[in-house]
């Protein structure tokens, strides 16, 4: 059984079922809504699996999205493609800039040709690297790396620390 968490790529960039996935998980809270307004998710699987395995749990546990929250996610889907395109372009610009920065040792972004899985990402993710990246700061040891990483976080002026991703805040 092949399960894929597609919350970073979303259906706008990657369709895991076409790549052989049996079950695909999507977070409606993150990119799909895009505004941080709901707690939602979707589990996509073959109809028989949903009927035989998931529906009994759903009936007993009550994990059903309210009509209003479903509507909110649907409204977010209307702008998903354009939001992800812009977010992915911005992430690529930032990744390129970080790759050249003297205080950065490594950038993790599948949209960069230097990424070891760049070709796979481009093939699977509609030719873009997505909207999320990470990087390592240059440091002599773990303590220095931690101190430098927190210095970067404390120096942010445009971005803020938050518990969600993919929304406009």
Which residue stretches match the model-derived regions?
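Conserved PLP-enzyme active-site core in the AAT-like
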Residues: 1-103, 108
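Conserved C-terminal alpha-helix-loop-beta "cap" of PLP-dependent enzymes
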Residues: 104-169
């Amino acid at each position: 059984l092949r399960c894929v968490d597609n919350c970073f790529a979303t259906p706008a960039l990657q369709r895991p079922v076409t790549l052989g996935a049996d079950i695909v998980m999507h977070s409606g809270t993150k990119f799909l809504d895009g505004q941080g307004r709901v707690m939602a998710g979707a589990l996509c699987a073959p109809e028989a699996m949903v009927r035989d395995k998931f529906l009994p749990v759903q009936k007993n546990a009550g994990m059903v999205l309210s009509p209003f929250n479903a509507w909110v996610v649907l409204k977010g889907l209307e702008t998903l493609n354009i939001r992800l395109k812009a977010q992915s372009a911005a992430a690529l610009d930032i990744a390129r800039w970080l790759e050249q920065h003297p205080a950065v040792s490594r950038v993790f972004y599948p949209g960069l040709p230097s990424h070891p899985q760049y070709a796979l990402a481009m093939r699977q993710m509609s030719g873009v690297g997505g909207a999320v990246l990470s990087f390592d700061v240059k440091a002599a040891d773990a303590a220095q790396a931690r101190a430098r990483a927190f210095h970067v976080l404390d120096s942010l002026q445009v971005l803020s620390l938050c518990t969600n991703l993919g929304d406009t805040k």
